[in-house]
Regions:
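Short, histidine-centered active-site or binding-site loop motifs used for metal coordination
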Residues: 12, 48, 103, 228-232
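Active-site substrate-recognition segment that forms the wall
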Residues: 29-30, 37-45, 133-135, 140-193, ...
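Generic structural signal for well-ordered, non-membrane alpha-helical segments
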Residues: 17-20, 24-28, 58-62, 105, ...
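Short, solvent-exposed beta-strand edge segments and adjacent coil->beta transition regions
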Residues: 47-49, 96-98, 182
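Short connector loops/turns at beta-strand edges and beta->alpha or beta->beta junctions
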Residues: 2-6, 90-91, 221-224, 231
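Flexible hinge/switch segments at interdomain interfaces of large molecular machines
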Residues: 84-93
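Dinucleotide-binding Rossmann-like beta1-alpha1 core, especially the glycine-rich loop
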Residues: 1-82
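Helical element adjacent to the flavin cofactor pocket in flavoenzyme catalytic cores
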Residues: 60-71, 92-156
Length: 233
């Protein structure tokens, strides 16, 4: 389920909640900067994200959410009625208006990662694939990463394992990192008649107001991607 900003504030306080949204904005901008600087082709689409009211009684909720995003966190937002979003986004039986927020966009994550790797290799950096780090030691102001194939010494390390961190490598991280699992399914390529059935126009990422996270977007080749939490059966 998704935690509302009010609940976040009640649990973590106003300042920590602001930091959360600030990190989201900075992360989006930083990703776009990397794509531009490294000249990565990763199917960037959309110029915002949308939150869609899936029921008519949710429209006031998203209007309030959009106002809080703008007033409390400085995030650019815009409200769309059901009819307005039907013109620029999509229609359907679970579309009762929406709001957009920026900065946001969609990418192909595999192409993004491959682009970073390609750039690193072009700068003569070494990438060791399928090499498990068994232990990290700190020695004389630097780190030693020990593997079965050998060791690497570095002044700085970045642990970028997503949620699949190996317990015991860095004691400060033990018990603090959890995987957030998502199930994703993609349709075949849809023709114009099929897309026009719900007037699906936007390529921006979309989520709706259901408590259980549900997101979707149109891909550049006119397939539709659907995603939701993956730890449920």
């Amino acid at each position: 389920s998704k935690m509302s900003f009010k609940k976040m504030q009640s649990i973590y306080g106003v300042e920590e909640t602001k930091k959360f949204f600030k990190n989201s904005v900075e992360g989006s901008n930083h990703t776009k900067d990397i794509i531009k600087e490294y000249n990565i082709e990763c199917d960037v689409t959309g110029d915002s994200s949308y939150v869609v009211a899936h029921h008519k009684n949710k429209f006031e909720q998203i209007k309030e959410q959009a106002e809080v995003y703008k007033s409390e966190f400085g995030i650019e937002t815009k409200i769309y009625s059901k009819e307005e979003f039907d013109e620029i986004g999509h229609g359907g039986t679970e579309q009762y208006g929406a709001f957009s927020y920026k900065p946001a966009f969609a990418i192909n994550p595999l192409k993004f990662v491959n682009g970073i790797a390609k750039y690193a290799l072009s700068k003569k950096l070494k990438i060791f694939e399928h090499t498990k780090v068994d232990k990290i030691d700190k020695e004389n102001g630097s780190y030693i990463l020990r593997t079965k194939e050998g060791s690497i010494r570095s002044k700085k390390i970045v642990v970028a394992t997503n949620g699949f961190y190996q317990e015991g490598l860095i004691p400060q991280m033990d018990g603090r990192v959890l995987p957030v699992i998502s199930n994703i399914i993609v349709t075949r390529k849809l023709n114009e008649d099929e897309l026009n059935t719900h007037n699906f126009k936007t390529f921006s990422p979309i989520a709706n107001t259901k408590n259980l996270l549900y997101y979707y977007r149109k891909l550049p080749d006119n397939r539709i991607l659907f995603g939701t939490r993956g730890d449920l059966t």
